[in-house]
UniProtKB/Swiss-Prot annotation:
Subunit text: Part of the 30S ribosomal subunit.
PANTHER family found in the cross-reference section: 30S RIBOSOMAL PROTEIN S12 FAMILY MEMBER
Gene Ontology MF terms: rRNA binding; structural constituent of ribosome
Pfam families the UniProt entry points to: Ribosom_S12_S23
GO cellular component: small ribosomal subunit
Record-linked NCBIfam families: PRK04211.1, uS12_E_A
Protein name: Small ribosomal subunit protein uS12
Keywords: Ribonucleoprotein, Ribosomal protein, RNA-binding, rRNA-binding
Family that this chain belongs to: Belongs to the universal ribosomal protein uS12 family.
Role played: With S4 and S5 plays an important role in translational accuracy. Located at the interface of the 30S and 50S subunits.
Amino acid sequence: MAKSPLGLFAGRVLKAKKKRQRWSISRYKRRELGLDRKANPMGGSPQARGIVLEKVGVEAKQPNSAVRKCVRVQLIKNGKSITAFLPRDGAMNFIDEHDEVHVEGMGATQGGAMGDIPGVRFKVFKVNGTSLHELVIGKKEKPRR
């Protein structure tokens, strides 16, 4: 292995060597090449709109036993399909196929799945422009198209 240059005027060479070595650090490489943004279906944005394709039930991981209510959503911006969780009791009753929904991340670490719902990284917070929370608690009615 070649030794690092020493001496008074070795700064430029040392700097260039450090720059080359940084590419072996995986975090640096992912950040510089934008791999996390490319892998993210929402393209790095915090929220996205989509069309509901179907309602699905996702089984919870062990030791819990439940069917978590989710929907398959096709994003408008790039056509990618994602699974989004429906928070709160009875939220599934307010969502039909072909509704327009707004989705956001679930808030888990590193953008991953949260809690006992495997493979679900996003949640629905609006249906046809109305807050899902307000629909569930009965403050607002779902607008008819």
